[in-house]
UniProtKB/Swiss-Prot annotation:
Inward rectifier potassium channels are characterized by a greater tendency to allow potassium to flow into the cell rather than out of it. Their voltage dependence is regulated by the concentration of extracellular potassium; as external potassium is raised, the voltage range of the channel opening shifts to more positive voltages. The inward rectification is mainly due to the blockage of outward current by internal magnesium. Can be blocked by external barium. This potassium channel is controlled by G proteins. Forms a functional channel in association with KCNJ3/GIRK1. Residues 136-147, 148-154 dip into the membrane without crossing it. It is found in: Membrane. One of its GO terms (cellular component) is I(KACh) inward rectifier potassium channel complex. Residues 112-135, 155-163 are extracellular. This is G protein-activated inward rectifier potassium channel 4.
Amino acid sequence: MAGDSRNAMNQDMEIGVTSQDHKKIPKQARDYIPIATDRTRLLTEGKKPRQRYMEKTGKCNVHHGNVQETYRYLSDLFTTLVDLKWRFNLLVFTMVYTITWLFFGFIWWLIAYVRGDLDHVGDQEWIPCVENLSGFVSAFLFSIETETTIGYGFRVITEKCPEGIILLLVQAILGSIVNAFMVGCMFVKISQPKKRAETLMFSNNAVISMRDEKLCLMFRVGDLRNSHIVEASIRAKLIKSRQTKEGEFIPLNQTDINVGFDTGDDRLFLVSPLIISHEINEKSPFWEMSRAQLEQEEFEVVVILEGMVEATGMTCQARSSYMDTEVLWGHRFTPVLTLEKGFYEVDYNTFHDTYETNTPSCCAKELAEMKRSGRLLQYLPSPPLLGGCAEAGNEAEAEKDEEGEPNGLSVSQATRGSM
């Protein structure tokens, strides 16, 4: 029994890295990282692909179907036009102007037809409503000149046509309204900060490892631009279906993940890449999740980064998500910041890179209970990246001493007392 317990403990605690990843580890820690063995487990093995709630690009995979009250979209026409794709937006832009020009061109032609101006083309003694208007094409061109205010040239309205003067006023007013509406739509669509979010980066994976003697869920964010995001803030949500005690099934239930709201750590000064940390404590949804349970769970962590664009003052939002298969247990992010002569340099080639580190396989709840009960919880000061939790019974320790094996990461209470 003791031998089986010891072997299981060693299997849980022995985590290594490949020689290829050895270069990505900080120089001061490379000597302390063990080489990967056959017992190294990958979290993504055995997982079936599932539908994402949110793509890595931030697009939500939610389609609204069977919408009966479609008139609601027309009640907010401005937002509807802004939300259209560019090809449809340009099509609407062109069609609106063309239709208004054709409509008023037809009215100008109708006035000329009713007055009989078309029958006196070239008659010097006849005073038409619009000089040199000889047909529908001329009326259409005159409508364009009137609405775009490019100035009259060959065709011009006369003062002997009161109905033409009234139509001129109406077209000028309606033309200004159309210009304000359509140009406003185009300006808002062009100035939308969606493209600003393209230069905000999230790490490809989230990691779970020890930080300050506590299990933490971490991911990294960065900004590629020199112009910073003002008042940047980060928040995260756990998307996971659950069933209540009454038997109600809640699909895609959203649970807040504390990333520093109570301490102010969620307010970011995003000049260089930052590692966002969520402490797994009693209030965390991952409180009872161990490494083995992580491989069986199905969830998605959605992260949202918000702030104001420094150049425009408009609010920008960047989103990403991490599936359960994208959460790496026992990993840390490779440092990307180095000190050069007179400045700090960020190496984005290693922005997504992680390296493995010894991390307890038990859940945070068990880790806290073991610490409170005085059972083994020993963090070695050297090497700095090694640490673990395990129970050490007197029987297991005696067997290790007989076999001449080092205690490793587990030390008996008597040994700890002597230290």
